[in-house]
Amino acid sequence: MQLPRWWELGDPCAWTGQGRGTRRMSPATTGTFLLTVYSIFSKVHSDRNVYPSAGVLFVHVLEREYFKGEFPPYPKPGEISNDPITFNTNLMGYPDRPGWLRYIQRTPYSDGVLYGSPTAENVGKPTIIEITAYNRRTFETARHNLIINVMSAEDFPLPYQAEFFIKNMNVEEMLASEVLGDFLGAVKNVWQPERLNAINITSALDRGGRVPLPINDLKEGVYVMVGADVPFSSCLREVENPQNQLRCSQEMEPVITCDKKFRTQFYIDWCKISLVDKTKQVSTYQEVIRGEGILPDGGEYKPPSDSLKSRDYYTDFLITLAVPSAVALVLFLILAYIMCCRREGVEKRNMQTPDIQLVHHSAIQKSTKELRDMSKNREIAWPLSTLPVFHPVTGEMIPPLHTDNYDSTNMPLMQTQQNLPHQTQIPQQQTTGKWYP
């Protein structure tokens, strides 16, 4: 790299001393110089190239210690900085990552992980991932580029694939190289293949699983797909026998002879294992027969005329009004016939009614009419109960309780003894002394 002229001689405006013999830079120029050197070397080391294979699990760890060097040193000397750092990853020029690439970071104090399984469509196409690190204490950022060059695999895809569900692991724990290596070693002891690769890892939450409760160190669970070049072993085939299928339908653990080889570190749900044999799958792909690319001749195109004929809506208007009106008229005539022409009449009804019943109803009507007339006229003669009577004791004639001009509408239905002016007083029995006849 060819350095500029001012790099060799320094800033002439910042020289101190007399003459050109003492070329010493000021502190401000020294700081600018170091910052420029820091930026140049950061740019040089900002890009990383990785070469994963198609159909094989790709794991890239975003180490916090690596990105700490991109931020200024901790202000207090002698103290180790442990700033919270988060990462944002996206495909260059796009807001998100490719469909096959996933990212996870549990806390700002843990490393981030990019993982996924590239497909054959990505072979030969460099995929540039922009990685932006955020320092949550100083709010500073640093950006690196990860260039993924997908290489083609010789035996892609592997013909025999098995997917295991591990209940006691989270996805970030399973992505650790030593844990994944231990699992592949256990599978290799059971399967005995010549070639074994991890194809993909998926969290149980991405398959519709529930978030575990924060008790008893419960895990989310993870699906691990592996592929091999030899048929499945007899131990793996034990899951498909009817006895184990029945136990799985009853939510019971199946009996697997090789489970003890995994139980020391991995708790596998054998009811959720999936065995895929690519050699027995019938290809549904149909070859597309391409034609000449020439459309059949449909004749000369004739666009519609510019002058449109006027449409007469008079007939539509008549039909719209005439049909409902005719239906309404017919219904009206039927109703009028039923109400007017089908009545029996009073005379016919009386002829069919017995005489005794007519007399009974006539008396009731006569009494009702008389009571109504009496209620309307309050000036009629008083009943016989209000005429003058003799006093039961003295024999004197007592005038009526009410005069002729008394307003009977305000008269109470019942009167107390105090309201009666001519009430006879009955002597009370003496309680003290002697009584002689």
From Swiss-Prot:
GO cellular component entries: cytoskeleton; dendrite membrane; Golgi apparatus; plasma membrane; sarcoglycan complex; sarcolemma
One Pfam short name: Sarcoglycan_2_C
SMART domains in the cross-refs: CADG (SM00736)
Coarse class of the protein's main subcellular location: membrane
Membrane topology reported for the UniProt record: Single-pass membrane protein
Keyword vocabulary terms for this entry: Cell membrane, Cell projection, Cytoplasm, Cytoskeleton, Glycoprotein, Golgi apparatus, Membrane, Transmembrane, Transmembrane helix, Ubl conjugation
Record-annotated membrane-spanning stretches: 318-338
InterPro entries per UniProt: Cadg (IPR006644), Sarcoglycan_alpha/epsilon (IPR008908), Sarcoglycan_C (IPR048347), Sarcoglycan_N (IPR048346)
Carbohydrate-modified residues: 200
Residues on Cytoplasmic side: 339-437
PTM text: N-glycosylated. Ubiquitinated, leading to its degradation by the proteasome.
Keyword Methyltransferase: no
Function: Component of the sarcoglycan complex, a subcomplex of the dystrophin-glycoprotein complex which forms a link between the F-actin cytoskeleton and the extracellular matrix.
Name of the protein described by the UniProt record: Epsilon-sarcoglycan
Taxonomy of the source species: Eukaryota, Metazoa, Chordata, Craniata, Vertebrata
